[in-house]
Amino acid sequence: MDRFKMIKEVGDGTFGSVWRAINKQNGEVVAVKKMKRKYYSFEECMSLREVKSLRRMNHPNIVKLKEVIRENDILYFIMEYMECNLYQLMKDRVKPFSEAEVRNWCFQIFQALAYMHQRGYFHRDLKPENLLVSKDVIKLADFGLAREVTSVPPYTEYVSTRWYRAPEVLLQSSIYDSAVDMWAMGAIMAELLTLHPLFPGTSEADEILKICNVIGSPDEQSWPQGLSLAETMKFQFPQVSGNQLAEVMTSVSSEAVDLISSLCSWDPCKRPKAAEVLQHTFFQGCTFVPPTVRSKAGVLPKTPPCVGVKGVSEHGMPRRYSTGTLSTTKPHSNASLKSSGLSKTGVQRKLQMDRQAPQKIKKPTESNNKLTTNRVPARNSPGHPVLRHSRSLPETGRATMHKVSTLTERLTHMSVTSRTRTTPKPAAPLLKAGLGKSDLLGKTDEIPPAKRLTRKLVS
């Protein structure tokens, strides 16, 4: 940790504290998460749920884990730094955010959730404190409670802050899925648009009461599984007639109310998937670009993969482990290679030509500066060597060429007649790039009628 200078503590939680720090080597500002418990082996560190999940995800709207360092049995996460979290922004606001701002943020979050859910993970702890903001970019953070969809239940009962906790979790269901993230996003969206929590319960029972007051009590048609869960834990839903969300959010558009209503459905199966939410009319005008396409087209900046993880061996010497590739997409360098027009074949060709020791064909001196030369268009960039084929049409007078190459020395006097195509008697050798003369020139155009012209090549 000597490479980092701690500047200021910016957060403190149950499992650790977060500091703003500077990398002394390159001046980069990073976030350092210092875990409170001690870890006595690096293998134990690498088995942490947060490390395992972040190593598998690479998305512009998911915070990057740069390094994992274990020093003196203390574990540090080196992560990319963001200016603040969503809770801090809401706390300092006087009036609610505009729908345009909420639309921009939520669209990014749902893209990250769609990416995450499709790869078999769900967050389980979505709340404004875990949504980090820098300017108009927002990213998911704190994957300490993230879990794989394929994990074997029962799951832990405590998940997320109570105000954003899904009803199936409140009723202590041990089986749930990514739908809990959808419920949390509905509550967060409503809070962004009103600056008031949608379900501010003081306990689990009070939280369910707050939910019933807004969307009504569940019944056999809306959520039969929920009634069974309540019966199991000897809980009875209060009988409240519902669907009063529009009354709570009077200054919000009908599209936003409709989306929040679908996200905050009692039945998890009736909540839309993250990928489906991106197609909702509330996000009309926003363009969804899948991460795989985005990295190729360069629509959004691609986030770099993890730099590595670092531990301390028994002898006190630091050891670095690779965190692996975070994405199956092609590296950014490949995308820039395509955009600049440098094909892989061209680069290989350049390398092959550099290995040889070719005799250079020097440009002939033209007496009247009217010699026409057919050539392959050259590019002044690596991977595109200039390939020339020396074939010229003479003027009426004789053109003298100096220092003619070995190729042209083999040619004798050549004459061109009207409507007649004349080719040199000996076949021209292949070019060094592996292309023949005919490949470069394609079809040879006939020379228009003219009086007999003669050209001599002089060594």
From Swiss-Prot:
Instruction: Give EC number(s), comma-separated.
Output: 2.7.11.22, 2.7.11.23
Residues with PTM Phosphothreonine: T156
Q: Which residues take part in binding ATP?
A: V10, G11, D12, G13, T14, F15, G16, S17, V18, K33
Source organism per entry reads Oryza sativa subsp. japonica (Rice)
- Residues annotated as catalytic: D125 (proton acceptor)
> Which keywords, in A-to-Z order, does the entry hold?
ATP-binding, Kinase, Nucleotide-binding, Phosphoprotein, Serine/threonine-protein kinase, Transferase
InterPro entries per UniProt: Kinase-like_dom_sf, MAP_kinase, Prot_kinase_dom, Protein_kinase_ATP_BS, Ser/Thr_kinase_AS
The entry lists its GO molecular-function terms as: ATP binding; cyclin-dependent protein serine/threonine kinase activity; protein serine kinase activity; protein serine/threonine kinase activity; RNA polymerase II CTD heptapeptide repeat kinase activity
Q: Where is the composition biased (Polar residues)?
A: 322-346, 366-375
Mitochondrion as a keyword of this entry, yes or no, is no
**Classification via Gene3D superfamilies:** Phosphorylase Kinase, domain 1, Transferase(Phosphotransferase) domain 1
Catalyses which reaction(s): L-seryl-[protein] + ATP = O-phospho-L-seryl-[protein] + ADP + H(+); L-threonyl-[protein] + ATP = O-phospho-L-threonyl-[protein] + ADP + H(+); [DNA-directed RNA polymerase] + ATP = phospho-[DNA-directed RNA polymerase] + ADP + H(+)
Per UniProt, residues of the Protein kinase domain are 4-283
Q: Does the keyword Signal apply?
A: no
Taken from the UniProt entry, a GO cellular component term is: cytoplasm
Stretch list, region Disordered: 310-397
Q: What protein name applies here?
A: Cyclin-dependent kinase F-4
Per the record, the similarity remark reads: Belongs to the protein kinase superfamily. CMGC Ser/Thr protein kinase family. CDC2/CDKX subfamily.
